Swiss-Prot record:
Residues 1-104 form the SSB domain. It comes from Staphylococcus aureus (strain MSSA476). One of its GO terms (molecular function) is single-stranded DNA binding. GO terms for biological process: DNA replication. Residues 122-146 are annotated as: Disordered. This is Single-stranded DNA-binding protein 1. The gene is ssb1. Homotetramer. Keywords: DNA-binding. InterPro entries: NA-bd_OB-fold, Primosome_PriB/ssb, ssDNA-bd. Pfam families: SSB. Disulfide bonds: none annotated. One of its GO terms (cellular component) is nucleoid. Transmembrane segments: none annotated. The lineage of its organism: Bacteria, Bacillati, Bacillota, Bacilli, Bacillales.
C-alpha cells in the first residue's frame, strides 16, 4: 500500500504556528494547486489543500513562507474526524507534510529593489561600489544573441 502526495502551489494565507499540549510545534496552511486542465471558459481552476507540518519544519515554514509563497510539499493524505460543539461528526482531509521545499527566495522583492537602486545610481554617474553591495550581473543580458558551443563540448 502507498499513501504519498506531492504538490506544488502557492500559500493562500500566512502559516499558523501553534504548539500541542505535548510541546510539539505544528504549522498549518492552505496550498492553492492549479489543475492541469481548463474549464469550459478556458480558465484554470485550482484546488485548495490543507497542509500540516510538525516540529522544526513547522518553525521554518512559519519563518520563511507567507501568503503567495511558492512551495513544494511531499507528504501523505490523512483523514481525521471529530465532534463539533453541535454534536455533529466533522471529517477533515489534509496532507501531513514529510518535507517542504521553499521554491523561491524569501527576499525576492528586496533583491529586485536592490538591483533597481544599483542601476539607478550607476546611471546618475555614481560609482557602483558606493553602496558597498555586490554587483549583480545579468547572465542572460545577451540572450538574444546566438550561443557559440562546439558539439564536442556537449555532454550528450
Amino acid at each position: 500500500m502507498l499513501n504519498r502526495t506531492i504538490l506544488v502551489g502557492r500559500l493562500t494565507r500566512d502559516p499558523e504556528l501553534r504548539t500541542t499540549q505535548s510541546g510539539v510545534n505544528v504549522a498549518s496552511f492552505t496550498l492553492a494547486v492549479n489543475r492541469t486542465f481548463t474549464n469550459a471558459q478556458g480558465e484554470r481552476e485550482a484546488d485548495f489543500i490543507n497542509i500540516i507540518v510538525f516540529k522544526k519544519q513547522a518553525e521554518n515554514v512559519n519563518k520563511y513562507l507567507s501568503k503567495g509563497s511558492l512551495a513544494g510539499v511531499d507528504g501523505r493524505l490523512q483523514t481525521r474526524n471529530y465532534e463539533n460543539k453541535e454534536g455533529q461528526r466533522v471529517y477533515v482531509t489534509e496532507v501531513v507534510a514529510d518535507s517542504i521545499q521553499f521554491l523561491e527566495p524569501k527576499n525576492t522583492d528586496d533583491n529586485q529593489q536592490d538591483l533597481y537602486q544599483q542601476q539607478a545610481q550607476q546611471t546618475r554617474g555614481q560609482s557602483q561600489y558606493s553602496n558597498n553591495k555586490p554587483v549583480k550581473d545579468n547572465p542572460f543580458a545577451n540572450a538574444n544573441c546566438p550561443i557559440e558551443i562546439d558539439d564536442n563540448d556537449l555532454p550528450f
